[in-house]
Amino acid sequence: EEKEKVKPNTDLEKEILNILKSITGIKDISTTDDFFEDLGLDSLNVMELSTRLSKYKIEIQDINYYSNIQKLAKKIETHNKVNFFEDKIRNDISIINRPFKYNMSSVLLTGVTGFLGSNILYELLINPEVKKIYCLIRKKYNMTVEDRFNKIVNNYFSNYDIKELIDKKVVLLDGNFEEIYLGLTLEEYYNLSKKITTVIHSGANVRHYGKYDVFYKANVQATKNIIRFCIDSKAKLAHISTISVGGYCNVNDKKLLTENKINVDQTFKNHVYMITKYEAECEILKEIENKNIDAKIFRLGNIMPRISDGRFQINMHQNGFLSRLKTLLDIKYTTNEINNLHIDISPVDLCAKFIIKLMEASCENTVFHISNPNFISMKEILNSFNVEFKLTNVENCINLINKLNNPLNAHLVNDLLSPELIETPYSCDITMKDLNSIKLEWPKITKDYLKNLYNLIMQI
């Protein structure tokens, strides 16, 4: 049945309505229409809407929560600073360190079609301890599981000699970790649970923006299902997480996320990726505390192109860091705030290698920070591009970006809108010690590496 069309009541509602008309081309919009279900907005539309409302300090996540004109206008009018999820944060989770040894002979790997997951696959293929690798993949876009697997191998490993190793070690499973029994039949699930010795859970929804329940299923429910499998199979778990579980803190706070902390009174600005990855860690830490599973958590930093051959993720435009650099290259301006940011550049092949090596080393710690500690300033990165960047202030920078009218620039606008908040600083000291003990270290980033990064950005 037709929903009644509600007309705008205020100037602000009218303004949002007109922007939506121009974005969607839909003439007849009700102020109660849901942006996603009724108007069919996609993530680029959302970025565009947030950019066009940036004078109201509206961020992308706000649009996902207040997802019709009435709610969004109200959010702007009340300057409602309440963050939807902050009350969910539990303060009673502790990280317990219990050393144990992984048996790597039979590994279940999720997320193999992702950039990190595919590089973890490579490390498992060349590791003689690993006899079988079961890859859990779901059918997608009319592509079979085999199609998706082959596409990844061809994209990332076309000039690697691994066909024989794949034929010998890899078993593809048509499943879905968001579902009960990992989307397998009960019989398949039961048979699998008798074989697997280690689970590497690299699968996740890593997009930056979207609806909470979609992320909850992919990042939290999935992790609960993986934990269930580990309990059923007595397999040990390696869980791939992110440094950004540290969320944001005030620029003047002296907060530090270490490998022995998960709560640092961070705020998440309604960032659903961060929130759900945080919640997933809490689920695992709870089960470790209750002695139900043996698990380690690997928090990854800024995953960047391989150091060996410069390859980067297929869906480059979805990478927030590259999008930000592209925006700066488009306007050829920067600010002191941007210049002074220090960035970790962690080549994906080293991330994958270090994860597997740390698993084999049976270290004391439960949580590791897989992030290159040789930080590099944005100023240094921009200088390496051989482009002249003029200096300006934040306000002018936002205006310049908005003139470009490209929704991908929303990442940088979001950063500039709340200069008082920074991503919570973290340290890698404990992980560094463990890496040093097995004779591994992160390299300093070279000019050539940055040159390759520049060439990649120019392809976006």
Tell me what each language-model feature is.
Residues 80-198, 202-205, 212:
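N-terminal Rossmann/SDR dinucleotide-binding element
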Residues 265-299:
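Active-site Tyr-X1-5-Lys
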Residues 106, 127-134, 426-460:
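Amphipathic terminal alpha-helices
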Residues 251-258, 286-343, 348-353, 357, ...:
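NAD(P)-dependent short-chain dehydrogenase/reductase
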Residues 334-338, 397-438:
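A hydrophobic C-terminal alpha-helical subdomain
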Residues 354, 358-415:
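Mid/C-terminal beta-alpha module of Rossmann-like enzyme folds, strongest
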Residues 1-97:
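Phosphopantetheine-dependent thiolation modules in NRPS/PKS and related acyl-activating systems
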Residues 193-194, 198-202, 209-217, 221-272, ...:
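Conserved Rossmann-fold NAD(P)-dependent oxidoreductase catalytic core, especially the SDR/UDP-sugar
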